C-alpha cells in the first residue's frame, strides 16, 4: 500500500488514534446513503427536486419578531446547482469547436438514453421552483451549458441499445442501462433470447423475404443486412438503401418500411425525403432518430445538391439550424432508407454519391386480399415477430452491405441517366469505327443524341 493510501486508511492505528476513522466511516456512510437514495426513475427525480426546492425555501426564509415569515425563491443559479446535483449531463461533442455549438444533453433515467430536450429540462427546473419566468428558465439552461463537460457518444459496434437493455454482441448478453454509455436513441423492441419465428395463418416473414429476393441469395442477405444496419447504426456502413418499384402498387415495399418503423418504435424514426436533407428546418426535425425514412420520393425531382445527405450517411458533423432556435452542431448516427417508384435525378454525378446507394427492387405484385391486408395491419406489428427480427438482426455484423448485381446494374443506369456525357460515351462512342474524329463533329453528335 502506498504511503498516501496508508495515511488515508481508516484501519491504520495512527488514523484511528486521531479519531479520523469515525470521520472516514461517516463520509463513507454518507456516500452509500446518497447512492441508495439517488433517483432511479424520472418520477423519483421530479419528486426529489421538489423536496430540494422546498428545503431551499425553508432554509432561506426570514422570520420576523411579529411572527410574519418572508419566503425567498431560489435564483436561476441556485436552481441550476440543484439540477446539477442529480443530472448526468453534458454536451455530446468530439472537440472544443463542437462544444461551443453543442446542445446540453442529459441522461433520461427511464429510457437509458441521453436527450437534448429543452422542454424536459425546463419542467425539471420548475419542479424546484414553479414561479420561474421564461427568461429565468433560459438563464438556467445557459448555466448548464457553461458548466457542461464533454460527453463522448458511445459508438462501440458491439453494444446496441434495445428496449430492455444494452445487448453485447461479444458476450451475447443483455446489460443494464447506465449513464456511462452515451446513446441518443434505442430500438424500442425487447431483446428476447428465446424468440422464434411465428407463423400467422400460414404466413411467415422468412418466406416473404424469399419472395422479394426471388431466389437471389445476395438480395436476401441485403434485406437482412438492412434490418441489421437499422438496429445498429454504429456499424457505420456509410450507405443508404433505396427501395424501388415501378409504381404499380402492392409490391410489399411500404410493408417493409412499416416493419422497420415498428422495429425501432414510435419517436425513433423520422420522415425525410432525399430533397428534404438539404432543407435546414426539416433536417433539424431528424435529430435523435435511429432511422430516417423517406416514403414515395418523386422520381421527377431534381436534387441540385446532396451535401447534407452524404454527411448524414457518413456520420459527419453538420450545423443544424432549427427554426426559431439557436443553431448547433450535430453528428447523425442513424440509417437512411428511401422509397421511390423510380430514381430521382441528381446534379452530383460523382462516385462519392453513388457508392452510398444500395438498391432493392420490389417487383412482385400481391393481390389486394383481406389476408394480405392483415400482414401490414397486424402481423408486422406483432411483438413476437419483432422480437424474432431483432434477435436475428443482432446476430449479424455487416461492416459492408452486400452490393448485389441488381443494385450495381440499377446504379449504372442511374449514373447514365444523370450524367449525359457518361450516357453518350457508354452508348454511342463504341459504335464509331474511326479512331480520329473532329471535335466539332463529336460535339454536334453529342447534342443530337441528347435531344438538344
Give residue spans per PLM region.
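Feature primarily recognizes SF3-like P-loop helicase cores of small DNA viruses
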Residues: 2-102, 127-452
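Trp- and S/T/G-rich repeat-edge/linker motifs of beta-rich repeat architectures
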Residues: 106-109, 113-128
Amino acid at each position: 500500500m502506498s504511503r498516501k493510501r496508508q495515511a488515508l486508511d481508516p484501519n491504520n492505528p495512527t488514523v484511528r488514534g486521531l479519531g479520523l476513522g469515525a470521520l472516514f466511516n461517516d463520509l463513507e456512510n454518507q456516500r452509500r446513503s446518497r447512492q441508495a437514495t439517488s433517483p432511479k426513475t424520472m418520477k423519483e427525480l421530479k419528486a426529489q427536486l421538489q423536496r430540494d426546492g422546498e428545503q431551499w425555501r425553508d432554509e432561506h426564509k426570514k422570520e420576523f419578531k411579529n411572527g410574519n415569515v418572508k419566503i425567498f425563491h431560489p435564483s436561476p443559479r441556485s436552481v441550476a446547482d440543484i439540477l446539477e446535483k442529480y443530472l448526468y449531463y453534458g454536451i455530446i461533442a468530439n472537440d472544443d469547436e463542437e462544444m461551443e455549438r453543442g446542445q446540453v444533453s442529459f441522461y433520461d433515467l427511464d429510457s437509458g438514453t441521453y436527450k437534448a430536450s429543452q422542454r424536459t429540462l425546463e419542467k425539471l427546473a420548475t419542479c424546484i421552483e414553479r414561479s420561474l419566468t421564461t427568461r429565468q428558465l433560459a438563464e438556467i439552461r445557459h448555466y448548464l451549458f457553461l458548466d457542461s463537460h464533454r460527453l463522448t457518444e458511445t459508438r462501440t459496434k458491439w453494444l446496441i441499445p434495445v428496449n430492455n437493455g444494452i445487448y453485447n454482441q461479444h458476450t451475447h448478453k443483455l446489460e443494464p442501462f447506465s449513464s456511462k454509455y452515451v446513446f441518443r436513441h434505442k430500438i424500442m423492441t425487447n431483446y428476447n433470447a428465446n424468440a422464434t419465428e411465428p407463423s400467422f395463418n400460414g404466413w411467415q416473414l422468412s418466406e416473404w423475404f424469399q419472395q422479394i429476393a426471388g431466389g437471389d441469395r445476395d438480395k436476401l442477405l441485403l434485406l437482412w443486412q438492412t434490418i441489421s444496419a437499422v438496429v445498429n447504426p454504429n456499424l457505420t456502413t456509410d450507405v443508404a438503401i433505396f427501395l424501388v418499384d415501378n409504381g404499380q402498387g402492392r409490391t410489399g415495399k411500404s410493408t417493409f418500411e412499416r416493419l422497420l418503423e415498428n422495429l425501432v418504435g414510435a419517436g425513433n424514426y423520422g420522415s425525410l425525403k432525399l430533397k428534404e436533407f438539404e432543407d435546414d428546418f426539416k433536417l433539424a426535425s431528424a435529430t435523435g432518430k435511429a432511422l430516417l425514412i423517406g416514403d414515395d420520393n418523386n422520381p421527377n425531382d431534381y436534387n441540385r445538391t446532396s451535401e447534407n445527405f452524404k454527411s448524414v450517411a457518413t456520420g459527419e458533423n453538420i450545423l443544424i439550424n432549427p427554426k426559431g432556435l439557436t443553431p448547433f452542431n450535430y453528428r447523425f448516427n442513424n440509417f437512411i432508407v428511401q422509397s421511390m417508384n423510380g430514381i430521382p435525378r441528381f446534379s452530383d454525378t460523382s462516385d462519392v454519391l453513388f457508392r452510398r446507394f444500395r438498391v432493392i427492387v420490389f417487383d412482385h405484385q400481391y393481390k389486394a386480399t383481406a389476408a394480405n391486408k392483415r400482414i401490414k395491419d397486424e402481423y408486422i406489428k406483432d411483438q413476437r415477430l419483432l422480437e424474432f427480427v431483432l434477435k436475428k438482426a443482432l446476430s449479424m455484423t455487416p461492416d459492408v452491405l452486400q452490393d448485389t448485381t441488381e443494385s450495381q446494374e440499377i446504379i449504372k443506369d442511374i449514373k447514365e441517366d444523370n450524367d449525359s456525357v457518361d450516357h453518350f460515351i457508354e452508348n454511342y462512342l463504341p459504335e464509331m469505327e474511326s479512331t480520329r474524329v473532329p471535335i466539332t463533329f463529336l460535339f454536334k453528335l453529342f447534342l443530337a443524341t441528347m435531344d438538344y
